[in-house]
C-alpha cells in the first residue's frame, strides 16, 4: 500500500470553492465508506475544516487511487470533476508524509503555527477509526503526525510566532476599530471549537461584555459560564448585533446566519458613533452572507481576506526549527514504512522454512516409525531451533537494510533468491508519471506533480 493525499486548501481555492468542497460531519461516515469501497483505496481519513478539505488514503496504485478519490469527492460534494480538479493538489508517498507533518505542525496553516489544526486532525482520525476506514498505514501516519505536531509546539517558539486564526482576525479588527478591544462589546455566534476559541481570546484581550449565541442553547450557556460571558437566545441575534462592535461567527450551519436582512435591521438600531460593526467570518460554509460586506458601517473579515492580509510567517528561526523537525520525522517515518514493506517478505520466508520443516518431519515419521513420541518431539525442537538460528541474522539484517533509502532492493533480492510469492507494490519514494484516469479531467495548475513534493 502507498500513501496518497488529495486535497484543496486556502492556498489553492477561494472560500467559495472550499464551501462547495466541505464535507459536513454528518456526511463523513458515508464519504469514508464510499472511499474505501473503491477498488484502489483500502484506508481513508477525510479532513474537512474551514481552510482545507483533504483525503489521506492508502492506495494500491497511484493513478487508480487518484481517480477513485476524485470520483468520490465529486460525488460527495456535488462539485463537477472539472471544477474540482482546478483546485486540487496531490502528494504521493514521501511528499504525502511531509505534507501531513507540515499540516500537523501548523506550517501549512493560513496563520503559521496555529495549534487548532491538531484537534481537527485528531477529530478526523477519530471519525475514520469509528467508520473502520483506517488500517496500519493511516493509523501510524495520524498518530505520528499528532506527535510531531505536539513536538513542534513544545520544542520551538512557533506558538509565540504564529497566532490562532481567531487571534489574527481580532488583530485585524483592532486596526479597523482604530483601538484595542478593551471594553468593546462582542458577540460570538457558534459554540463549537472555533467559537470556544473566540470567547477565550476575546476574554483574554479584555473585550466585554461578551455574549454567546448558538442554535443549541445548552452549549451556549456552558461556554458562556466558562468565561464569564452571557448566553443569549439565537432568537435575539438581531437585537444583540445592534449592541456590539465585534462579532466572531463560527458556526457549522449549512446556510448564512448573518444575512443582509438581519444585519440591516441591526444597523438601524445601532448608533453610527460606535464606529464600524466588524464581522469576523471564520466559518465554512460562510456565516456572513456575501452582500453584507456592501452595507455601510460594516467591515467583514472572511477567510479570503485573512489570506490576503494576515502576515502568516513566524520568526525565521522558529520556522526553520520546525522544518528541521519535520524533515527528521519524515525520514524516521519512511524508515518505518520501508521496514513495514519488507515484513511480508520476511514472513513469507519464515513460512517457507516452517513448511519445509513440517514436510521433512513428516517424511522422517514415515521412514522411522520406531521413534518414540519423545524422540520425535526432540528432533522437531532441534530442527526448529536450527532453522530459526539460520534465519535470525539474515532477517534482522534485511529489516535494517530495508529501512535505509533504497532498501527496497534487499527485500526484492530475498524474494528472488527464495522464490517467494509476496504481493508486489512500488517501493517507497518511487514516483509514477502523473497521468490522471480518463474518468477524471487532468489536474489544474494547483495540483502537484508528486515528483516535486511542492506545496
From Swiss-Prot:
Catalyzed reactions per annotation: (S)-4-amino-5-oxopentanoate + tRNA(Glu) + NADP(+) = L-glutamyl-tRNA(Glu) + NADPH + H(+)
Binding-site residues for NADP(+), renumbered to this chain: 190-195
Pathway listed: Porphyrin-containing compound metabolism; protoporphyrin-IX biosynthesis; 5-aminolevulinate from L-glutamyl-tRNA(Glu): step 1/2
UniProt keywords, alphabetically: NADP, Oxidoreductase, Porphyrin biosynthesis
UniProt key word Oxidoreductase: yes
Quaternary state and interactors: Homodimer.
Protein's name according to its UniProt entry: Glutamyl-tRNA reductase
Taxonomic placement: Bacteria, Bacillati, Actinomycetota, Actinomycetes, Micromonosporales
Amino acid at each position: 500500500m502507498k500513501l496518497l493525499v488529495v486535497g484543496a486548501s486556502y492556498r489553492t481555492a477561494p472560500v467559495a470553492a472550499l464551501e462547495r468542497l466541505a464535507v459536513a460531519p454528518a456526511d463523513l461516515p458515508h464519504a469514508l465508506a464510499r472511499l474505501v469501497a473503491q477498488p484502489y483505496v483500502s484506508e481513508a481519513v477525510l479532513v474537512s475544516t474551514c481552510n482545507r478539505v483533504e483525503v489521506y488514503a492508502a492506495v494500491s496504485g497511484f493513478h487508480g487511487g487518484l481517480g477513485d478519490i476524485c470520483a468520490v469527492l465529486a460525488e460527495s460534494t456535488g462539485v463537477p470533476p472539472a471544477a474540482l480538479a482546478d483546485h486540487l493538489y496531490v502528494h504521493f508517498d514521501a511528499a504525502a508524509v511531509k505534507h501531513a507533518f507540515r499540516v500537523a505542525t501548523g506550517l501549512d496553516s493560513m496563520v503559521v503555527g496555529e495549534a487548532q489544526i491538531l484537534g481537527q486532525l485528531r477529530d478526523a482520525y477519530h471519525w475514520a477509526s469509528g467508520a473502520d476506514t483506517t488500517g496500519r498505514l493511516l493509523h501510524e501516519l495520524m498518530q505520528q503526525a499528532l506527535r510531531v505536531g505536539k513536538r513542534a509546539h513544545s520544542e520551538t517558539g512557533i506558538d509565540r510566532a504564529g497566532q490562532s486564526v481567531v487571534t489574527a482576525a481580532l488583530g485585524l479588527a483592532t486596526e479597523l476599530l482604530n483601538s484595542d478591544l478593551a471594553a468593546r462589546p462582542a458577540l460570538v455566534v457558534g459554540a463549537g471549537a472555533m467559537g470556544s476559541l473566540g470567547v477565550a481570546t476575546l476574554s483574554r484581550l479584555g473585550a466585554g461584555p461578551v455574549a454567546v449565541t448558538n442554535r443549541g442553547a445548552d452549549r451556549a450557556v456552558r461556554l458562556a459560564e466558562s468565561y464569564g460571558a452571557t448566553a443569549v437566545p439565537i432568537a435575539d441575534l438581531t437585537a444583540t448585533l445592534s449592541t456590539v462592535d465585534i462579532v466572531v461567527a463560527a458556526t457549522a450551519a449549512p446556510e448564512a446566519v448573518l444575512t443582509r436582512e438581519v444585519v440591516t435591521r441591526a444597523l438601524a438600531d445601532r448608533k453610527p458613533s460606535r464606529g464600524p460593526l466588524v464581522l469576523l467570518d471564520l466559518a465554512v460554509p460562510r456565516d456572513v452572507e456575501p452582500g453584507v460586506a456592501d452595507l455601510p458601517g460594516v467591515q467583514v473579515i472572511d477567510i479570503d481576506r485573512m489570506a490576503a492580509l494576515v502576515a502568516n510567517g513566524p520568526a525565521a528561526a522558529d520556522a526553520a526549527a520546525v522544518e528541521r523537525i519535520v524533515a527528521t520525522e519524515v525520514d524516521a517515518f519512511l524508515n518505518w514504512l520501508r521496514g513495514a514493506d519488507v515484513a511480508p517478505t520476511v514472513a513469507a520466508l519464515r513460512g517457507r522454512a516452517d513448511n519445509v520443516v513440517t514436510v521433512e518431519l513428516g517424511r522422517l515419521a514415515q521412514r522411522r516409525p520406531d521413534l518414540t513420541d519423545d524422540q520425535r518431539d526432540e528432533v522437531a525442537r532441534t530442527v526448529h531451533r536450527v532453522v530459526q538460528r539460520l534465519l535470525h541474522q539474515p532477517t534482522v539484517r534485511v529489516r535494517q537494510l530495508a529501512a535505509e533509502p533504497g532498501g527496497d532492493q534487499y527485500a526484492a533480492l530475498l524474494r528472488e533468491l527464495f522464490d517467494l510469492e509476496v504481493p508486489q507494490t512500488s517501493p517507497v519514494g518511487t514516483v509514477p508519471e502523473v497521468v490522471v484516469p480518463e474518468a477524471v479531467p487532468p489536474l489544474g495548475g494547483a495540483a502537484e506533480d508528486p515528483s516535486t513534493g511542492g506545496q
